[in-house]
């Protein structure tokens, strides 16, 4: 089967860097050197790593959202991992840093998003980088500018672990920037949610087995969306944006708890259970 590529992208998966204060101080120091040298350029005000480009429509947001969270769910943290920034140089019209350490994360995001039927990654090889500034055509044509940029030094590492302020985001190309961040469609913390552990590694494993009609009988009217697809979406992951909803239904529905624990439907053994109060 031919692979579709996002060669005309309209969104990207963003890894924002503004939360990492030590990196930002050094990053801004590099920008100051460039401006102090008189290089005509537009400074990047939202430092980030573009992990993959996307060609998606608003109706795909839900699928990409879930794919991102499944990547987070499947991460094997160990002692965490390091991201290394080095080698300022010119890439196209931009001054960039090489970025090492996120290759596996890029591959996982592409694979999980494609598994949802959405278009990710480009036909050209992905190169991990962090943009510092964009050069004007005039600045790019000045040999002294090019020589200065190629002579610059930068070497910085950040460690990513479950307590780091690392996030994965869906961002539309051309999105507004404010206070060092892009306006996002979806933004998820990559760390482990210590406040709640799902009864299964993947709640999605029981989707299609647990019966919504039975679950609805144990809940208050309106607790679950009337549309079945919307209801499954609400229950299909336990991350930041609906952790309260998941815990609420898990507490209230005996059937849902048993289905989660057994990874199977237990309708034949269903009985009315008392509703637990918050």
Swiss-Prot record:
Coiled-coil annotated spans: none
Keywords noted in UniProt: Host cytoplasm
Subcellular location: Host cytoplasm
Gene3D superfamilies in the record: Cyclic phosphodiesterase
Lineage start: Viruses, Riboviria, Orthornavirae, Pisuviricota, Pisoniviricetes
Keyword DNA damage among UniProt keywords: no
Family membership: Belongs to the coronaviruses ns2a protein family.
Protein name: Non-structural protein 2a
Recorded GO CC terms: host cell cytoplasm
Effect of residue 278 to Y: In strain: Isolate ATCC VR-759, Isolate clinical OC43-Paris, Isolate 19572 Belgium 2004 and Isolate 87309 Belgium 2003
Pfam families named in the record: Corona_NS2A
The UniProt record lists the keyword Iron: no
Stored InterPro entries: Coronavirus_NS2A (IPR007878), NS2A-like (IPR039573)
